[in-house]
Amino acid sequence: MLRIPRDEPVLFASDTHLAPEAPETAERFLAALEREGPTAPHLFLLGDLFELWVGDDCADPLAARLAAILSGLAARGVAVRLMRGNRDFLLDVPRPGAWDVPYSARCGATLLDDPCPLELHGVPALLAHGDALCTDDLVYQQWRATCREPAWQATFLARPLAERFAIGRGARETSEAGKREKPGALMDVNAAAVDAAMDAADATLLVHGHTHRPATHRWRAGGAERTRVVLTDWDAPAGRGALLRWEDGRAVA
Protein backbone atom coordinates (compact mmCIF):
# COMPACT_ATOMS: atom_id res chain seq x y z
CA MET A 1 0.00 0.00 0.00
CA LEU A 2 1.14 3.51 -0.81
CA ARG A 3 2.09 5.51 2.28
CA ILE A 4 2.61 9.26 2.19
CA PRO A 5 4.26 10.69 5.33
CA ARG A 6 2.87 13.74 7.08
CA ASP A 7 5.75 15.98 6.05
CA GLU A 8 5.03 15.50 2.31
CA PRO A 9 2.26 17.76 0.91
CA VAL A 10 -0.12 16.43 -1.74
CA LEU A 11 -2.03 18.11 -4.57
CA PHE A 12 -5.35 16.76 -5.87
CA ALA A 13 -7.47 17.59 -8.90
CA SER A 14 -10.17 15.95 -10.98
CA ASP A 15 -12.81 16.74 -13.58
CA THR A 16 -10.81 19.20 -15.63
CA HIS A 17 -12.64 17.99 -18.78
CA LEU A 18 -9.95 19.28 -21.11
CA ALA A 19 -11.34 19.94 -24.58
CA PRO A 20 -10.58 22.25 -27.52
CA GLU A 21 -14.03 23.79 -27.00
CA ALA A 22 -13.03 25.00 -23.51
CA PRO A 23 -9.68 26.79 -23.97
CA GLU A 24 -10.06 29.06 -20.92
CA THR A 25 -10.57 26.10 -18.63
CA ALA A 26 -7.59 24.29 -20.15
CA GLU A 27 -5.36 27.33 -19.63
CA ARG A 28 -6.54 27.70 -16.04
CA PHE A 29 -5.66 24.09 -15.25
CA LEU A 30 -2.35 23.97 -17.09
CA ALA A 31 -1.24 27.24 -15.52
CA ALA A 32 -2.12 25.91 -12.06
CA LEU A 33 -0.04 22.81 -12.69
CA GLU A 34 2.96 24.84 -13.82
CA ARG A 35 2.63 27.24 -10.89
CA GLU A 36 1.78 24.87 -8.04
CA GLY A 37 2.92 21.47 -9.27
CA PRO A 38 6.56 21.92 -8.20
CA THR A 39 5.50 22.88 -4.64
CA ALA A 40 4.41 19.37 -3.58
CA PRO A 41 6.09 15.98 -4.01
CA HIS A 42 2.80 14.22 -4.85
CA LEU A 43 0.16 15.00 -7.49
CA PHE A 44 -3.02 12.96 -7.86
CA LEU A 45 -5.33 13.53 -10.84
CA LEU A 46 -8.49 11.56 -10.11
CA GLY A 47 -10.19 11.14 -13.45
CA ASP A 48 -12.01 13.01 -16.20
CA LEU A 49 -8.87 14.86 -17.19
CA PHE A 50 -10.35 14.90 -20.69
CA GLU A 51 -13.88 15.51 -21.85
CA LEU A 52 -13.42 12.76 -24.42
CA TRP A 53 -10.73 10.08 -24.76
CA VAL A 54 -11.14 7.44 -27.44
CA GLY A 55 -7.73 5.79 -27.26
CA ASP A 56 -4.06 6.46 -26.59
CA ASP A 57 -3.50 7.12 -30.30
CA CYS A 58 -5.31 10.47 -29.96
CA ALA A 59 -3.13 13.19 -31.47
CA ASP A 60 -4.60 15.83 -29.20
CA PRO A 61 -2.59 19.07 -28.73
CA LEU A 62 -4.02 19.55 -25.22
CA ALA A 63 -3.06 16.01 -24.28
CA ALA A 64 0.45 16.65 -25.60
CA ARG A 65 0.74 19.89 -23.58
CA LEU A 66 -0.48 18.20 -20.42
CA ALA A 67 1.91 15.28 -20.93
CA ALA A 68 4.82 17.71 -21.35
CA ILE A 69 3.95 19.53 -18.12
CA LEU A 70 3.42 16.35 -16.12
CA SER A 71 6.58 14.67 -17.43
CA GLY A 72 8.46 17.85 -16.53
CA LEU A 73 7.12 17.65 -12.99
CA ALA A 74 8.05 13.98 -12.82
CA ALA A 75 11.59 14.82 -13.95
CA ARG A 76 11.80 17.25 -11.02
CA GLY A 77 10.88 14.50 -8.57
CA VAL A 78 7.11 14.92 -8.30
CA ALA A 79 5.26 11.60 -8.09
CA VAL A 80 2.47 12.01 -10.65
CA ARG A 81 -0.47 9.61 -10.41
CA LEU A 82 -3.46 9.37 -12.72
CA MET A 83 -6.83 7.68 -12.37
CA ARG A 84 -9.39 6.98 -15.07
CA GLY A 85 -12.77 8.71 -14.96
CA ASN A 86 -16.04 8.15 -16.74
CA ARG A 87 -14.98 10.37 -19.67
CA ASP A 88 -11.47 8.97 -20.08
CA PHE A 89 -11.94 5.35 -19.04
CA LEU A 90 -9.91 4.25 -22.09
CA LEU A 91 -6.68 5.85 -20.85
CA ASP A 92 -3.84 3.32 -21.12
CA VAL A 93 -6.09 0.64 -22.63
CA PRO A 94 -4.07 -0.97 -25.47
CA ARG A 95 -5.50 -1.13 -28.98
CA PRO A 96 -5.57 -4.60 -30.55
CA GLY A 97 -2.40 -5.14 -32.57
CA ALA A 98 -1.07 -1.63 -31.89
CA TRP A 99 1.97 -0.40 -30.01
CA ASP A 100 0.79 2.97 -28.73
CA VAL A 101 2.77 4.48 -25.87
CA PRO A 102 0.41 4.46 -22.86
CA TYR A 103 -0.64 7.98 -21.99
CA SER A 104 0.51 7.60 -18.38
CA ALA A 105 4.01 6.75 -19.66
CA ARG A 106 4.01 9.90 -21.81
CA CYS A 107 3.25 11.82 -18.61
CA GLY A 108 5.89 10.08 -16.50
CA ALA A 109 2.97 9.03 -14.31
CA THR A 110 1.63 5.95 -12.57
CA LEU A 111 -1.91 4.80 -13.35
CA LEU A 112 -3.93 4.07 -10.22
CA ASP A 113 -6.69 1.57 -9.66
CA ASP A 114 -10.14 2.96 -8.88
CA PRO A 115 -10.62 2.86 -5.95
CA CYS A 116 -7.10 3.20 -4.56
CA PRO A 117 -6.38 2.69 -0.84
CA LEU A 118 -3.44 4.47 0.74
CA GLU A 119 -2.19 5.87 4.01
CA LEU A 120 -2.29 9.66 3.78
CA HIS A 121 -0.45 11.51 6.56
CA GLY A 122 -1.11 8.65 8.95
CA VAL A 123 -4.80 8.31 8.04
CA PRO A 124 -6.26 5.26 6.27
CA ALA A 125 -7.67 6.79 3.09
CA LEU A 126 -9.37 5.87 -0.16
CA LEU A 127 -9.13 7.69 -3.49
CA ALA A 128 -11.75 7.26 -6.21
CA HIS A 129 -13.10 9.02 -9.26
CA GLY A 130 -16.55 8.73 -7.71
CA ASP A 131 -18.82 7.47 -10.47
CA ALA A 132 -18.90 3.93 -9.08
CA LEU A 133 -20.44 5.35 -5.89
CA CYS A 134 -23.46 6.82 -7.72
CA THR A 135 -25.30 3.52 -7.43
CA ASP A 136 -28.81 5.02 -7.58
CA ASP A 137 -28.27 5.76 -11.28
CA LEU A 138 -28.90 2.23 -12.53
CA VAL A 139 -28.80 3.14 -16.22
CA TYR A 140 -25.34 4.67 -15.84
CA GLN A 141 -24.04 1.76 -13.74
CA GLN A 142 -25.13 -0.69 -16.45
CA TRP A 143 -23.27 1.36 -19.06
CA ARG A 144 -20.24 1.62 -16.78
CA ALA A 145 -20.07 -2.15 -16.43
CA THR A 146 -20.41 -2.64 -20.19
CA CYS A 147 -17.79 -0.14 -21.33
CA ARG A 148 -15.19 -1.53 -18.95
CA GLU A 149 -15.46 -5.06 -20.27
CA PRO A 150 -12.23 -5.99 -22.12
CA ALA A 151 -14.18 -7.40 -25.08
CA TRP A 152 -16.19 -4.19 -25.51
CA GLN A 153 -13.05 -2.06 -25.27
CA ALA A 154 -11.15 -4.21 -27.77
CA THR A 155 -14.01 -4.00 -30.27
CA PHE A 156 -14.31 -0.24 -29.88
CA LEU A 157 -10.57 0.42 -30.08
CA ALA A 158 -10.29 -1.67 -33.24
CA ARG A 159 -12.40 0.94 -35.07
CA PRO A 160 -10.70 3.76 -37.02
CA LEU A 161 -9.87 6.84 -34.95
CA ALA A 162 -12.33 9.11 -36.80
CA GLU A 163 -15.14 6.64 -36.21
CA ARG A 164 -14.28 6.40 -32.52
CA PHE A 165 -14.38 10.19 -32.22
CA ALA A 166 -17.78 10.30 -33.91
CA ILE A 167 -19.16 7.63 -31.59
CA GLY A 168 -17.63 9.33 -28.56
CA ARG A 169 -19.10 12.72 -29.43
CA GLY A 170 -22.50 11.17 -29.96
CA ALA A 171 -22.32 9.38 -26.62
CA ARG A 172 -21.28 12.61 -24.90
CA GLU A 173 -24.24 14.50 -26.37
CA THR A 174 -26.62 11.74 -25.31
CA SER A 175 -25.14 11.76 -21.81
CA GLU A 176 -25.49 15.52 -21.44
CA ALA A 177 -29.10 15.40 -22.64
CA GLY A 178 -29.83 12.59 -20.19
CA LYS A 179 -28.42 14.55 -17.28
CA ARG A 180 -30.95 17.31 -17.82
CA GLU A 181 -33.76 14.82 -17.30
CA LYS A 182 -32.35 13.12 -14.19
CA PRO A 183 -33.06 14.28 -10.63
CA GLY A 184 -29.96 15.81 -9.04
CA ALA A 185 -29.92 13.27 -6.23
CA LEU A 186 -29.66 10.45 -8.75
CA MET A 187 -26.27 11.75 -9.90
CA ASP A 188 -24.79 12.07 -6.41
CA VAL A 189 -23.06 9.34 -4.43
CA ASN A 190 -25.11 6.85 -2.46
CA ALA A 191 -24.37 7.03 1.28
CA ALA A 192 -24.51 3.26 1.72
CA ALA A 193 -22.15 2.75 -1.23
CA VAL A 194 -19.72 5.24 0.31
CA ASP A 195 -19.75 3.44 3.66
CA ALA A 196 -19.36 0.06 1.97
CA ALA A 197 -16.33 1.24 -0.01
CA MET A 198 -14.75 2.77 3.08
CA ASP A 199 -15.49 -0.36 5.12
CA ALA A 200 -13.82 -2.54 2.48
CA ALA A 201 -10.70 -0.36 2.56
CA ASP A 202 -10.74 0.21 6.33
CA ALA A 203 -10.63 3.92 5.49
CA THR A 204 -11.73 6.96 7.47
CA LEU A 205 -11.02 9.45 4.65
CA LEU A 206 -12.40 9.37 1.10
CA VAL A 207 -11.31 11.81 -1.63
CA HIS A 208 -13.18 11.77 -4.94
CA GLY A 209 -14.50 13.88 -7.79
CA HIS A 210 -17.11 13.20 -10.49
CA THR A 211 -20.18 14.82 -8.92
CA HIS A 212 -19.07 18.46 -9.41
CA ARG A 213 -20.31 19.18 -5.87
CA PRO A 214 -17.19 20.29 -3.98
CA ALA A 215 -17.63 19.96 -0.23
CA THR A 216 -16.32 18.27 2.88
CA HIS A 217 -18.72 15.85 4.59
CA ARG A 218 -18.22 14.42 8.08
CA TRP A 219 -20.22 11.73 9.85
CA ARG A 220 -19.79 8.79 12.21
CA ALA A 221 -19.95 5.13 11.26
CA GLY A 222 -19.00 2.14 13.38
CA GLY A 223 -17.98 4.42 16.21
CA ALA A 224 -15.41 6.31 14.13
CA GLU A 225 -15.52 9.70 12.44
CA ARG A 226 -15.34 9.62 8.66
CA THR A 227 -14.57 12.39 6.18
CA ARG A 228 -15.47 12.63 2.49
CA VAL A 229 -13.76 15.33 0.46
CA VAL A 230 -15.33 16.08 -2.93
CA LEU A 231 -13.05 17.80 -5.45
CA THR A 232 -14.25 20.65 -7.63
CA ASP A 233 -14.76 20.46 -11.34
CA TRP A 234 -12.99 23.02 -13.55
CA ASP A 235 -14.92 25.66 -15.50
CA ALA A 236 -12.98 28.89 -15.99
CA PRO A 237 -15.90 31.03 -17.28
CA ALA A 238 -17.86 30.05 -14.15
CA GLY A 239 -14.86 30.77 -11.92
CA ARG A 240 -14.40 27.16 -10.82
CA GLY A 241 -11.23 25.12 -10.65
CA ALA A 242 -8.35 24.88 -8.19
CA LEU A 243 -5.87 22.31 -7.02
CA LEU A 244 -6.64 20.99 -3.54
CA ARG A 245 -3.56 21.03 -1.31
CA TRP A 246 -3.35 18.50 1.51
CA GLU A 247 -0.78 19.49 4.09
CA ASP A 248 -0.10 18.31 7.64
CA GLY A 249 -3.13 16.04 7.59
CA ARG A 250 -5.74 18.46 6.26
CA ALA A 251 -6.88 20.46 3.26
CA VAL A 252 -5.31 23.92 3.30
CA ALA A 253 -6.42 25.29 -0.10
At which residue positions do the language-model features occur?
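Core catalytic region of metal-dependent phosphoesterases/phosphodiesterases
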Residues: L2-P9, A13, L18-L120
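Hydrophobic/basic alpha-helical segments enriched in Actinobacteria
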Residues: E8-V10, D15, E21, E27, ...
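Short, surface-exposed linear patches
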Residues: A32-E36, R65-A68, Y103-A105, C147-A151, ...
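N-terminal short leaders/motifs
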Residues: D57-R76, E181-L186, A193-L206
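A broadly tuned preference for mixed-charge, low-complexity surface segments
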Residues: A63-I69, L91-Y103, Y140-W143, A171-V189, ...
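Conserved beta-sheet core of the metallophosphoesterase superfamily
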Residues: V101-D113, P124-L126, D131, T135-W143, ...
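Active-site-proximal loop/helix segment associated with metal-binding centers of metalloenzymes
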Residues: A128-N190
